[in-house]
Swiss-Prot record:
It holds the Pfam family SnoaL_4. It comes from Mycobacterium tuberculosis (strain ATCC 25618 / H37Rv). Was identified as a high-confidence drug target. This is Uncharacterized protein Rv2910c. InterPro entries: NTF2-like_dom_sf, SnoaL-like.
């Protein structure tokens, strides 16, 4: 029996690229949730543009955003970033993705209010000598609800 090559099948390289990018997105969430902000240096390019304005944040280049994250997230003793619906498109040494994030954030204080955020991460990536890195990230708001 002859095997017929299905042209719609992903190559091993394409599968590897997609898995590496998916892991990079998980690495972002882990770095944020564990407050290991220096780990973000292995997620973003040094000149990456990041736009968090859709949910009340700021936009700018990675160094500015990294500093802002380490300051503003101190207002929340507990938070978590849960990712899903990974849609990754690879084109040679560049790629893009759209991933949904569910992000509950507990405010400090006696009332323990929780801000539930639903958002999309729309990202562009570039392959570097050290692996894939995010070169552009824009948040798109789905919902925010305080409880």
């Amino acid at each position: 029996m002859c095997a017929v090559l299905d042209r719609s099948m992903l190559s091993v390289a394409e599968i590897s690229d997609r898995l590496e990018i998916q892991q990079l997105l998980v690495d972002y969430s882990s770095a944020i949730d564990q407050r290991r902000f220096d780990d973000l240096d292995r997620v973003f390019t040094p000149d990456a543009y990041i736009d968090y304005r859709a949910l009340g944040g700021i936009d700018g280049r990675y160094p500015k955003i990294k500093q802002w994250l380490s300051q503003v997230l101190g207002n929340f003793p507990v938070y978590a970033h849960m990712l899903g619906n990974f849609s990754v498109r690879v084109d040679g040494d560049t790629a893009s993705s759209r991933v949904i994030c569910f992000n509950p954030m507990v405010f400090a204080g006696d009332r323990q209010q929780v801000l539930f955020c639903g958002l999309w991460y729309d990202d562009d990536f570039v392959r570097t000598p050290d692996g894939w890195r995010i070169i552009r990230r824009v948040e798109t708001k789905c919902f925010q609800k305080m409880m």
